Amino acid sequence: MGVLSEFKAFAVKGNVVDMAVGIIIGAAFGKIVSSFVGDVIMPPIGLLIGGVDFSDLAITLKAAEGSAPAVVLAYGKFIQSVLDFVIVAFAIFMGVKAINRLKREEAVAPTLPPVPTKEEELLGEIRDLLKAQNNRP
């Protein structure tokens, strides 16, 4: 088997395709969460704290000199990234929890014993008759 055919077999496996779809959806979901945190959650929190825009919070370590930019510690962006992570982690947790609950419900669902077919009933009757004949003196 050549390298190209091995790669083709690997690339079209269900797990690889599923993983690629998951990564693409995850990237899009990350953008949605970042927008949600930056545009919906952080402004009211900043307003409650005193009109502070968290993304602008920073400590200047060294002022700008000439053409060299200032060296800053942008902790506001870090706070926003932490909130992004917490929201994404919580959403994933809730999704996994829901999937696990569905799996448990499937496992708990009682399975009824199969109804014997006519042939199985007939074979059972024949078995019982043979046992009865063998037990006679």
Swiss-Prot record:
Gene3D superfamilies recorded: Large-conductance mechanosensitive channel, MscL, domain 1
Major site of localization recorded for this protein: membrane
One Pfam match: MscL
Record keyword Protein biosynthesis present: no
Keyword annotations from UniProtKB, A to Z: Cell inner membrane, Cell membrane, Ion channel, Ion transport, Membrane, Transmembrane, Transmembrane helix, Transport
Topology class, membrane: Multi-pass membrane protein
Parts of the chain that traverse the membrane: 9-29, 79-99
Gene Ontology annotations for the cellular component aspect, listed alphabetically: plasma membrane
Location in or out of the cell: Cell inner membrane
Molecular function GO terms recorded: mechanosensitive monoatomic ion channel activity
Chain segments annotated as coiled-coil in the UniProt record: none
Disulfide bonds: none
Protein family (similarity comment): Belongs to the MscL family.
NCBIfam families: mscL, PRK00567.1-4
Function: Channel that opens in response to stretch forces in the membrane lipid bilayer. May participate in the regulation of osmotic pressure changes within the cell.
Subunit structure and binding partners: Homopentamer.
Family matches, as HAMAP family: MscL
Name recorded for this polypeptide: Large-conductance mechanosensitive channel
Source organism (scientific name): Pseudomonas fluorescens (strain Pf0-1)
